[in-house]
């Protein structure tokens, strides 16, 4: 059941209209780092960041800006309500935990058994060469609680990577974003699929044949991953958690890419040998 506080904020259109302003009378920030935007500014941010991230899918700052600009006035409120409708989601909203190197001990995670959630997470971080402190702070979402929901989504993103095994290469990111879109309906995750146009022919073929069917099937069928209290799952068996959430582990993309590179190299060497004789 939604709380009175939730009911007062459920209608995003009424809230946005009641906060109308111009660049000449910009209101005070609602939380540290908040930047209130006019409708025109938000639209410009959405278009600019969408074009920029399509040109360079590795620009995490542009992808973050696109996520915030397109999440309001409806989608982030919907995701917040998904959390409010779930006991664990409500606890997350109440406690507002953060995932970073200050709250998660990497040494502790490395000491866990190999098939635990925490060990799977830190092994994925080590393999991909990333850390838990790379997520930008939310700036452009007006509602403080909804800003936290977006921040939580960002900080949990690497856990989604870890339990699926998908790498941070563009091909892996698109596959995971497609899963996230089916599961969260955040527009930025859906728009990320346009980056398929920048993939190599063999990568495009893998996306349409392997990643897209897996992402849609699992994103729609699995439980809302935003409601997972990852900090409380670290010592659990990762296969058990996948089963509970209803997530099938996809094919090992890193291994597929490695095999393809090896086959390509062998074909090139064979061609050189044939020319020589």
Swiss-Prot record:
Residues 1-14 form a transit peptide. It catalyses: a 4-hydroxy-3-methoxy-5-(all-trans-polyprenyl)benzoate + H(+) = a 2-methoxy-6-(all-trans-polyprenyl)phenol + CO2. One of its GO terms (cellular component) is extrinsic component of mitochondrial inner membrane. Keywords: Lyase, Membrane, Metal-binding, Mitochondrion, Mitochondrion inner membrane, Transit peptide, Ubiquinone biosynthesis, Zinc. It is a peripheral membrane protein. It is found in: Mitochondrion inner membrane. Its cofactor is Zn(2+). Belongs to the COQ4 family. This is Ubiquinone biosynthesis protein COQ4, mitochondrial. The gene is COQ4.
